[in-house]
């Protein structure tokens, strides 16, 4: 039975999972790596840490499964999106640490672009807004701030890529410089309607075309790993950004299906089919996947803080020692208190898009303690998801008929408390699948589809299995009261921004 290996390169760790042809998991390995915070709002990774942990976990997973390179039909890569690496085209040496998707250093540059009236043009081409979150302004910053970088780029000496592209380059020994349409669609440089890099956008941000990778289908032959990495060459046949990979792993192939992934942040995607839907509620229009040259689009809402709110409770406040303690602690909170956490630690994502504001707690009393803080942290994830859910239903013309169930995945879905509260606030069922590793599964599926190991999308969807459905149990009056309180808290926070 052949294996398909998924590389899942995330914000805080790298993982590798071997899937069997029946979609069961044979083995997995995970290794964390450090994040660097050189200034307020700046987040960086060492590219060598990304590479070393990726290779180490691949080898560890292969060892656990007793698999050799000959046993693996294909590799699929999924990655933290928007994070950028720029490297020397000959040596492969990065010119700077990777600038991570959470990084806000280009906020002022983005503000200037908006003030110049450029956002409507950018949004029309990319489906995105002008925000430090996306790759384009990060690349521009590197070219303008690393000594000699712009001149080297103009001479064709530098390559740019998102993390998938960087890993592909390294895996193939520098032979392949490519990415897929999902990752390209997150750069602010890619026209999602034409499916190509856009000259007007490249000129706007000052990015030479010679730096850019080839853009391919999400399921395609990308190249072959050099033999010395895994004791033999393995073909690389699938690439997708992490949220699009999770959408595929959740089998959201039908327009109207929606999934939400809970990791460091929270990301909800609604499949809109072959037609890109323009949002009137500050959602993003993005590429869900591209197969056989045909793009499927999605509406996306991006929240920057979800699981990291629990990390803050643990590492910042010392309220808990383990994430699993958060739900039971929240259960002990005083129901008479209404404490709201707006976790804008790095600004606010959809649907508010304010990079300047910072987090705040509302409704504190003398009796507020650890239980109330845990309660507020978990509920903040649910409230933010509600904001995305409401925006998607407003933008999607067939929402009442289609977007009736939310499929969830990611580490936080292990918390029954959080998932039940999510169903209560959405007033909709929340479905947790049997296979929680949906991001890795999506990458594996794309690779296995190209390799002929996995079936066509609809047959794959037929194999999706439900672990638990959380049904809403909160009264309408309580729901409305809680949502109104959240709305006031968000409004109060936004009012602290002098730019508002």
From Swiss-Prot:
Binding-site list for ATP: 11-13, 264, 307, 311, 411
Molecular function in Gene Ontology: ATP binding; glycerol kinase activity
Keywords, ordered alphabetically: ATP-binding, Glycerol metabolism, Kinase, Nucleotide-binding, Transferase
BP term (GO), one: glycerol metabolic process
Activity regulation as described: Inhibited by fructose 1,6-bisphosphate (FBP).
Gene Ontology annotations for the cellular component aspect, listed alphabetically: cytosol
Catalyzed reactions: glycerol + ATP = sn-glycerol 3-phosphate + ADP + H(+)
A Pfam family recorded for this sequence: FGGY_C
InterPro entries: ATPase_NBD, Carb_kinase_FGGY, Carb_kinase_FGGY_CS, FGGY_C, FGGY_N, Glycerol_kin
Binding site for ADP: 11, 15, 264, 307, 411
Pathway info: Polyol metabolism; glycerol degradation via glycerol kinase pathway; sn-glycerol 3-phosphate from glycerol: step 1/1
PROSITE patterns per UniProt: FGGY_KINASES_1, FGGY_KINASES_2
Record carries keyword Nucleotide-binding: yes
Binding-site positions, glycerol: 81-82, 133, 242-243
Enzyme Commission no: 2.7.1.30
Free-text function comment from the UniProt entry: Key enzyme in the regulation of glycerol uptake and metabolism. Catalyzes the phosphorylation of glycerol to yield sn-glycerol 3-phosphate.
Family that this chain belongs to: Belongs to the FGGY kinase family.
Name of the protein described by the UniProt record: Glycerol kinase
Species: Rhodopseudomonas palustris (strain ATCC BAA-98 / CGA009)
Annotated gene: glpK
